[in-house]
A protein has these predicted regions:
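Catalytic grooves of carbohydrate-active enzymes
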Residues: 27
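Glycine- and acidic-residue-biased ligand/ion/polar-headgroup-sensing regions
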Residues: 61-63, 70-75, 80-100, 137
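Residues in flexible loops and secondary-structure boundaries
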Residues: 63, 68, 73-76, 122, ...
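A short glycine-rich, His/Asp/Glu-containing loop-to-beta-strand
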Residues: 31-33, 50-72
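Alpha-helical bundle regulatory/interaction domains
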Residues: 2-23, 31-44, 48-50, 96-180
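Short, flexible, glycine/charge-rich loop motifs used to bind or transfer phosphoryl groups or to couple energy/partner
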Residues: 55-56, 75-78, 102, 121-122
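Conserved hydrophobic/aromatic beta-strand scaffold that supports enzyme active sites
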Residues: 57, 65-67, 86-87, 111-113, ...
Length: 180
């Protein structure tokens, strides 16, 4: 499992790159988050819950590293991404993502990988705070072409559930690289 200290170091470091804090207006939060990812529908679950959203965002060449929490249970839905995929790792709480190949329950030991061609519906628990890595599709295609030695004709697709437990060193290495 990814070390808690590494995640803590990464999230503390990302605090230097706030996009917004204490967002409580649904339309404003949806607009700001949609500017980083894609336009989407956002609905707060339960009449007694209110948003207290925050997001940190660091844009790199072909990726971005983000933390996002809504402070309330929310439903989110959007059309397929065309230019990127997302690795979504809850640092606290649980998120259920309904994608093309079923439902992924993401939590600290299982990240959700959202492919570029999947329509998306998510339910975030009220205490769900996530590390979200956005990777441009062109970078993935170039990397695969380099590794395979020939052009990739179709979208590269990955399994939607990434087990972050011991033994899956590749995924941990990617997160570790970003965390250090």
């Amino acid at each position: 499992m990814l070390k808690t200290k590494e995640l803590s170091n990464l999230t503390e470091w990302l605090d230097k790159y706030p996009l917004f804090h204490s967002g409580d207006e649904v339309d404003e939060v949806r607009h700001k988050v949609g500017g980083i990812f894609v336009p989407h529908h956002l609905r707060v679950l339960g009449q007694q819950q209110h948003l207290s959203a925050n997001m940190n965002h660091l844009q790199l060449d072909n990726t971005s590293v983000n933390t996002l929490g809504y402070g309330a249970g929310v439903n989110i839905s959007c059309d397929p991404f065309e230019q990127f995929l997302l690795i979504m790792l809850p640092m606290t709480g649980v998120m259920h993502a309904t994608v093309e190949d079923g439902v992924v329950e993401a939590h600290k030991n299982v990240a959700a990988l959202i492919n570029t061609s999947d329509p998306l519906s998510m339910k975030w628990g009220e205490n769900c705070n996530q590390l979200i890595i956005r990777i441009n599709k062109a970078l993935i295609a170039r990397t695969c072409e380099t590794l395979l030695g020939h052009p990739v004709k179709d979208d590269v697709k990955f399994s939607s559930a990434l087990q972050m437990a011991q033994g899956n060193d590749m995924y941990q290495s990617i997160i570790h690289l970003l965390a250090t």
